[in-house]
Amino acid sequence: MFINSYFPTVIWSEEKPEFVKSLNKASNKYISDARKREKEFIKKHGDFGRSYHSAPLTVDNDFLDFRNYIGQKSWEYLDHQGYDMSQYQTIFSELWVQEFAKKGGGHHSAHIHWNQHVSGFYFLKCSDKTSYPIFHEPKTGARCTKLKMKPDMKGVWPGHEQFHLKPKPGTLIIFPGYLEHEYAVDFGIEPFRFIHWNIQAVPKEMAKDVL
């Protein structure tokens, strides 16, 4: 019997540690500003359970080389899936850095980013003691009809409804914008910081009016 897999959820990942040092340095001011914006909240409730988000990074030239790299890789990611990218212009809709609270509790509940074609993560500060991304089964029909898995299964199998990746500094992950994802609760043992981005593929006839 032939085993065929159709309609896969494609996730790319690689290790690119060469960006870590410069992007951590460039990110420090953004995380500092994000914490200052939350100063009153921290004073009242403490530094627990928070995720400190930066302002947009799309126009900061300290991130230019990285932005060009992930922009090209995101284009290649779509092209690899068979899309006719000669008809589309890829545009960053969002690019930001964030850091979880030092005293722990930082997390993201499961979500998607509306009207995006490519999403991605690049990890700047993390370890086996920090949070990590969790991805969920994107097919509604499959989620509705899941069965109980065998108790001794190891690894990721087609029947699983979610899986996680354990990154290290320099890990880059690219995935479809429709893929639901979340971040496990961080315990505040070691710093956790990462860059997140979203990209839209806009028809060139439309893109020429906005670029």
Q: What positions do the PLM features span?
A:
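Short clusters of hydrophobic/aromatic residues that line enzyme substrate/ligand-binding pockets
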Residues: 52, 133, 183
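Solvent-exposed residues in well-ordered beta-strands and their adjoining turns
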Residues: 17, 123-125, 198-202
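Active-site region of the double-stranded beta-helix
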Residues: 59-91, 101-117, 124-128, 207
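A structural signal for short, well-ordered beta-strand segments
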Residues: 95-97, 120-122, 195-199
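Non-heme Fe(II)/2-oxoglutarate
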Residues: 1-88
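Catalytic core of non-heme Fe(II) oxygenases with the double-stranded beta-helix
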Residues: 98-172, 205-207
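Short hydrophobic/aromatic beta-strand or adjacent loop that forms the aromatic wall/cage
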Residues: 7-11, 117, 192-194
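Catalytic core of Fe(II)/2-oxoglutarate
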Residues: 154-211
